[in-house]
């Protein structure tokens, strides 16, 4: 049976690579809905190729031009954040690929879980912000959440057939990003253009900056805690510059299982869509004979304090991970716009975490309020520093 997909963030890096997978298996997958923020040209191009039933754009000001440009298609055209949250619940949809960037992915993911859709999760901020709510809802509605992140896919694959109570440690690998070998002095003057030159992965701008600052890895620690039910004390980050070992699990008997592969996001995307099957592909293979070495290093929290801030946010709990995410979204954008220096980002995040209102047992409405408050605090701190 052909599975019907809704792709949230179809014009972004994960969204476009998901469409690559769908092109390779037209007998297995069909695009039911395409949703994007505001990249109207790419969205129109995708709609004309895949003929979805629904096309949705978050930016309501683009509704009329989008509708006009898709007038030749027999499809529904919707606009707005609420429309995206409604699209994911449509009965014909089997899998929702949650690839929207940042906090914007939270509400539609919640609605998709409530509707019982299989979730292929690429939006890690959803679990960073509201991991407890997401996991409780998934359990209540018997909704599978399949990780798309290469690291969490590797952990997931390493745990197939294993008892999770026998996990001793999760070994979460990180490339180290473009500034892995930089001194603090060198990092004082790096620019967004420098940070966007990732050595191994092809990703969107926001996540590439997060990778450079190692906030992305901090988010992945939090994501792993919720996905696999492991306390953060049992999650160890290893800097692995070659990006061949995507992550590993160490068990209570001392054995380690790892997943290796070329740094190509289409592989974990395909696995999330096809699980529990594996589909034959022509993706690049790793030639083990050609590998000179596989190295692993301790992360340097002095040069990359964002990773430590993520661990701290999880230990404090409550709404603090939501504060962490909101402040990071503010400084990430500010850095890309030249309003914030690279090393300043962690300072603003730490100050925001110290000043934001703490809520020990947040509900959904608390997360919404926390996100708004933390963004406001972070902007105020940025203005004072500029």
Predicted regions located by residue number:
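Catalytic, metal-anchored helix/loop core of enzyme active sites in primary metabolism
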Residues: 1-386
């Amino acid at each position: 049976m052909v599975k019907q997909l809704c792709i949230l963030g179809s014009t972004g890096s994960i969204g476009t690579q998901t469409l690559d997978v769908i092109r390779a298996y037209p007998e297995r997958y069909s695009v039911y809905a395409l949703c994007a923020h505001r990249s109207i040209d790419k969205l129109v191009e995708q709609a004309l190729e895949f003929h979805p039933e629904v096309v949705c754009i978050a930016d309501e000001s683009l509704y009329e031009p989008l509708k006009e440009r898709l007038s030749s298609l027999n499809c529904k055209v919707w606009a707005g954040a609420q429309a995206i949250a409604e699209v994911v619940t449509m009965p014909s949809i089997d899998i929702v690929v949650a690839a929207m960037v940042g906090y914007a992915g939270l509400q539609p993911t919640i609605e998709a879980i409530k509707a019982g859709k299989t979730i292929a999760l690429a939006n890690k901020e959803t679990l960073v912000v509201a991991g407890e709510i997401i996991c409780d809802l998934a359990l209540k509605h018997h909704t599978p959440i399949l990780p798309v992140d290469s690291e969490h896919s590797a952990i997931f694959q390493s745990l197939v057939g294993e008892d999770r109570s026998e996990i001793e440690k999760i070994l979460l690998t990180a490339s180290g990003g473009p500034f892995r070998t930089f001194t603090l002095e060198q990092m004082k003057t790096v620019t967004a253009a420098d940070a966007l030159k990732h050595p191994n992965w092809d990703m969107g701008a926001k996540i590439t900056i997060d990778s450079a600052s190692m906030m992305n890895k901090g988010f992945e620690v939090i994501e792993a805690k919720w996905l696999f039910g492991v306390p953060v004390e049992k999650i160890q980050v290893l800097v692995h510059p070659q990006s061949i070992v995507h992550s590993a699990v160490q068990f209570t008997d001392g054995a380690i299982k790892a997943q290796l592969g070329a740094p190509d996001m289409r592989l974990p995307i395909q696995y999330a869509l096809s699980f529990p099957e594996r589909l034959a592909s022509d993706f690049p293979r790793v030639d083990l004979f050609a590998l000179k070495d596989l190295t692993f290093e301790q992360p340097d929290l002095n040069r990359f304090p964002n990773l430590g801030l993520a661990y701290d946010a999880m230990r404090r709990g409550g709404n603090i991970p939501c504060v962490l995410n909101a402040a990071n979204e503010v400084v990430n954008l500010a850095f890309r716009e030249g309003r914030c220096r690279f090393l300043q980002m962690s300072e603003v995040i730490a100050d925001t975490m110290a000043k934001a209102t703490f809520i020990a047992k947040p509900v959904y409405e608390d997360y919404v309020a926390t996100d708004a408050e933390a963004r406001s605090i972070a902007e105020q701190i940025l203005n004072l520093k500029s």
